Amino acid sequence: PAPYYQCVFDHRLFDLFHDALKKTRQLFTLEDRPFGQSIKLLGGDGFSWDMEEGIYSGYTISYFALQLAVYMGFKKIFFLGLDLKHDGHNTHFFGQDPQTINHEKTEFPRMIKMLQHGANVLADTGIKVYNCSPVSTLEAFPKISFGDAAAL
């Protein structure tokens, strides 16, 4: 079945997964993408509580999705597959991208900084964010197993 909600802002994914993305019930993306519910990009650093004003990229779709989930009213948010590390030659879930081979030194530190910022912003709100990725360099959110997450 098609996912209810999906977030994509990488232009390449609209070409690679065009048919699958078209089947998504609610696709959230940035302005100037071929289709989907577009949200104005406010910049890289910051945290948006109101998608009508816009969203911050945090340099990763995970940060985009975090803000969107908060805006939608979710009180428990679970990250799965957010490892922020390369697995051998693969740089992304869809394989290798030569343009991002150095992400661990260039982009990952910015992503980690912003995800930590998100954790700090949400610390006293009652919104709980969990990292269900068994192998992950991200320490901003408590790590729990997928089984424990499903039991919450």
Feature roles, as predicted:
Residues 1-152:
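Metal-ion/cofactor- or nucleotide/acyl-coenzyme-handling active-site neighborhoods
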